[in-house]
Amino acid sequence: MERKGLAARSSGNPSPPALGEGPRPVPPPCVPSGGGAPERGQAGTAAEPAELIRRAHEFKSQGAQCYKDKKFREAIGKYHRALLELKGLLPSQEERDARPASSAGVPKSSRLSEEQSKTVEAIEIDCYNSLAACLLQAELVNYERVKEYCLKVLKKEGENFKALYRSGVAFYHLGDYDKALYYLKEARTRQPTDTNVIRYIQLTEMKLSRCSQREKEAM
């Protein structure tokens, strides 16, 4: 708004030059300076991967502390900030498939060492798992979003117990009992004695049994 005000004030007729003065030179157009805090995209472009990873790890740690303090909304914000720092460091599977082998540009991921790539993926997995955990603490749970985050984890780490279990819970509450049972049974193969998994499997099987009974009655 300040720039607009300046433009409005400078658009009026300038005062005539004093007697004996020549024509006044026309001032150059105002060009925004490069000062001030850079936007996230600019910072992300300029920062080295090691610095982005360090900041992401710091935000993730802050999110974990907020979760312990039961400040779930703040924790969600911290985990999102962590993921934002890592955005673009690891290409998605679609990007990897679409990128030609002789690409002229050097992607950010090529600047990562093997250890850095593993660290980035581990942080992403932790953040998505933690986001799902935070959402499940809400009074009104967004199970669609819980499912989304858990499936992101499973794309990277298909045997992740927490993501399997929470996927099953999300699908159960979304009414997709077949998928719920699949993910819950997958979770049970990782931790056969987990009481929460066993309880949700029982609940899901009861729902499926009722659905089957209704279908028979309808016939």
Curated annotation (Swiss-Prot):
Residues 1-49, 94-115 are annotated as: Disordered. Keywords: Phosphoprotein, Repeat, TPR repeat. Coiled coil: none annotated. TPR repeats lie at residues 56-89, 125-160, 161-194. The modification Phosphoserine is found at S102. Gene3D superfamilies: Tetratricopeptide repeat domain. SMART domains: TPR (SM00028). One of its GO terms (biological process) is bone development. PANTHER family: PEPTIDYLPROLYL ISOMERASE, TETRATRICOPEPTIDE REPEAT DOMAIN 9. Belongs to the TTC9 family. This is Tetratricopeptide repeat protein 9A. It comes from Mus musculus (Mouse). The lineage of its organism: Eukaryota, Metazoa, Chordata, Craniata, Vertebrata. The gene is Ttc9.
